[in-house]
Amino acid sequence: MASQSSNHYRVYIKNLSYSTSEKDLEELFGKFEPVNVLIPSYTIHFSRSGRHRPLGIAYAEFRTPEQIESVVKEFDGHVLKNRKITVKKHMAYDPNNRRFSFKRKSNIKNGKMNQGGSSTGEILAPVAKEFLVRDDETVSIGQQKKNPPRKPELSMDTIMIQKVHGKVTDESLKDFFKEYNPSQIYIFKSKKPKLNPMNLTGSHVNVLVKLDVTQTKLDEIISNLRSQKMNGRYISMKPAYKSKVLEVEKAIAESKSLENTGEGENMIVDEKASPTNKHGKNAEHDNSEISLIGTVSNC
């Protein structure tokens, strides 16, 4: 490895395939006669064989700044082993500057390395920082960046109340929301997680309440009621997800269908469970994500 004092110039390559070797890069940059090529790697933890894995980046050194200009121009965006690689001038990391940014070019001209110290050390020092900052930009050819998950759509007229004490009734809910003319009240229960079947806080249910929002918006209703207690307890309210309202309405429709066949009496609705009748049998072989608890009230 040549020393820093030899005035060599370096490029940084990222988004490399793990199967790319230093020889592959030497051949790729062959006509520009690279002085040296390095693909940093790390040891896989808990590997008995002491296996190494590359970081997906590399460094290549050339003799003149004109060479690195030509290399960047010709190979930035080049496809190598089904990956579109990025090639750019290397900018040395300064550990004494905590606010160091890869976009700053102070004290660095045309990718030239700083004087002093060995070239090997200069190459290895910035590996960790550049890898951590840039790793999320690795994209294979033909692979599209995933769109961020869309936020669930909120209902404009229905409030969700989670983990209400199990003794709550539709009458107490009607009284609590009486100023906003509740038209539908759905009470349903979440299934207890299998990993933690013990319940030391008592029985809880969830509630959906459809309100009249022609005069007052739902967020304002929630704000107005937040300081009030129901059955001596504060409750947590928020706009319901439309998807949850649809699940409950679907479960209700199924329960009404069963009532017409004489099997829908005393319908119980648990989330993640199928509706059951009073005999404990599955009311319908359906994978509905919500099953009804007790009370469905048309106010």
UniProtKB/Swiss-Prot annotation:
User: What is the source species?
Assistant: Candida dubliniensis (strain CD36 / ATCC MYA-646 / CBS 7987 / NCPF 3949 / NRRL Y-17841)
Name recorded for this polypeptide: Regulator of rDNA transcription protein 5
Which family does this protein fall into? Answer: Belongs to the RRT5 family.
Q: Does the keyword Cell membrane apply?
A: no
Name residues in a coiled coil.
Answer: none
Q: Gene encoding it? A: RRT5
Q: Name one GO cellular component term.
A: cytoplasm
Provide a Gene Ontology MF annotation, just one.
Answer: mRNA binding
Q: Which Pfam families match?
A: RRM_1 (PF00076)
